[in-house]
C-alpha cells in the first residue's frame, strides 16, 4: 500500500515500510494557542490535548514522562482550544497555515512523515515478485529525479566536442539524420 508513515505509526500495525517515497511530507506536532509563549514540552504536563493520533501522542508523552488527558477527535482538531475542549492539540502539519488560521502555533514535532510503500510481512512469493518489480520501478524514478534527458541535433564535425561536455553514463546515443552531415545526439 502507499500510505502516510504517520498512519502506520498510529495504527501500530505489523507492516514493513519498503520504501520512503519523498512526497506528501508532513509533521505530527503539538501546537498551542499563539498567546502561550513557551515551546517547552513540560507545558503539556496535566493539560488536555485534542488529537486524531491518540496512540502516537500517548507513546510520545510516555517516553517524555508527561501525563496529559487526551481527547480523541476525528477531523478539525485545530478548533479544540478555541472552544475550550483542550489546552493544545496534536495534528499533522504541512505548512502550518491551518494552525495559523486558528490562532495556534507549532511547538514540538513528535515525528516527521511522508508517503511510504508498505507491505504485509506475510506476502505470497507471487505477490512478493510483483512487489519487487514495483519497488525496482519506484527506485528508478527516485534515482532519476536529478537527471535530465538531453536530445539535440549536432553537426557531425562537432559530435565529439559536444559529447565531451555532456554528462553521460557511458557514451551518448548518436543517430544520423536525413540531412547530410547532421546527427541526433541523445544523452
What positions do the PLM features span?
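Portal/gating segments that form or line small-molecule/metal binding sites
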Residues: 1, 19-28
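Small-molecule-sensing regulatory modules
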Residues: 2-15, 34-187
Amino acid at each position: 500500500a502507499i500510505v502516510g508513515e504517520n498512519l502506520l505509526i498510529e495504527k501500530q500495525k505489523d507492516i514493513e515500510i519498503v520504501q520512503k517515497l519523498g512526497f506528501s511530507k508532513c509533521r505530527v506536532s503539538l501546537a498551542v494557542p499563539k498567546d502561550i509563549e513557551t515551546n517547552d514540552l513540560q507545558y503539556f504536563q496535566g493539560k488536555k490535548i485534542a488529537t486524531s493520533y491518540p496512540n502516537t501522542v500517548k507513546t510520545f508523552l510516555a517516553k517524555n514522562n508527561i501525563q496529559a488527558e487526551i481527547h480523541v477527535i476525528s477531523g478539525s482538531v485545530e478548533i479544540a482550544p478555541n472552544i475550550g475542549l483542550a489546552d493544545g492539540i496534536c495534528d499533522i502539519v504541512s505548512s502550518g497555515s491551518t494552525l495559523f488560521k486558528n490562532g495556534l502555533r507549532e511547538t514540538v514535532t513528535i515525528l516527521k512523515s511522508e508517503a511510504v510503500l508498505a507491505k504485509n510481512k506475510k506476502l505470497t512469493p507471487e505477490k512478493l515478485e510483483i512487489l519487487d518489480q514495483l519497488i525496482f520501478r519506484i527506485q528508478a524514478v527516485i534515482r532519476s529525479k536529478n537527471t535530465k534527458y538531453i536530445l539535440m541535433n549536432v553537426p557531425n564535425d562537432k559530435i565529439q566536442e559536444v559529447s565531451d561536455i555532456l554528462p553521460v553514463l557511458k557514451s551518448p546515443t548518436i543517430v544520423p539524420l536525413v540531412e547530410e552531415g547532421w546527427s541526433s545526439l541523445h544523452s
